[in-house]
Amino acid sequence: ECLVGSEMCIRDSYMMERFLERISLSEYRDKFILKGGMLVAAMVGLDARSTMDLDATVKGANVNVEDIENLISAIVSVPIDDGVKFQLKSISEIMDEAEYPGIRVSMTTTFDGVVTPLKIDISTGDAITPREVRYSFKLMLEDRSIDIWAYNLETVLAEKLETIITRTTTNTRMRDFYDIYILDQLHGNTLNRQTLHDALRATAHKRGTERHLAEAAEVFEEVENSSVMQKLWESYRRKFSYAADLEWNIIMRAVRSLYALSEKESSL
């Protein structure tokens, strides 16, 4: 993850944004659904979340190396007068611990003589509950937005909750914990309880982990009291200024609270 506010972080984010605008103007605009770090950073503000990843799910298209190569080539060929050039470097299947099978696209971007690597992970068949939403993505350097399809908030949170519950103390991605805290802080009042409940169960069903949900309370206890997890969180706090004031118990309280909310099925 890049350090928030650093030149590299801003440049990375800008290049991802340039790719998103090309998607929004391409024939594939209704097939690409944004998720992951770039979406969370957009939701909470770049000063509150670092990102190095652009994750998307694709619907209505095959996710294999050849088809994705054609799709990406078409997107980066969209003519935009922003001085940014994209070059495809490699496309490969994702095999590392992926919740969903997918394709990893590696590109380089060139802007004003500076070359920046850009990585995009593309999956298909994600459980989006109830469905993707139109997201108004604010541009960094211009006073306008682009409309793209994206995960809804409940599905973003459900995926992170499911990961925390099923990976227990083997989940070294502290950003999953931070994201739950910050998204709840900033957008918790907009959450639909029933949708969150349904999204968590749909995600677990898709990943074949439904049996783990019943163990959530024990998992949270184990994770909160784990010295390994506490050390990982302390390291994250030192690295990222936006998390510096957040104690581990505050983070875990947010995780427990979100899970409790998902457990309460609406009576409506």
Where are these regions (language model features)?
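Residue-level preference for beta-strand/loop junctions
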Residues: C2, S50, E99-P101
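Short, mixed-charge aromatic SLiMs
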Residues: L39-G45, R201-H212
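Extended interaction regions within the primary functional domain
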Residues: I10, G37, N152
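Catalytic cores of NTP-dependent nucleotidyl/adenyl transfer enzymes across multiple folds
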Residues: E7, E17-E21, K31, A61, ...
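Short amphipathic alpha-helical segments enriched in leucine
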Residues: E1, L20-S24
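Active-site nucleotide-donor binding segment shared across nucleotidyl transfer reactions
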Residues: S24-L54, V58-G60
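Single conserved hydrophobic/aromatic residue that forms the stacking wall/gate
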Residues: E1-G5, C9-I10
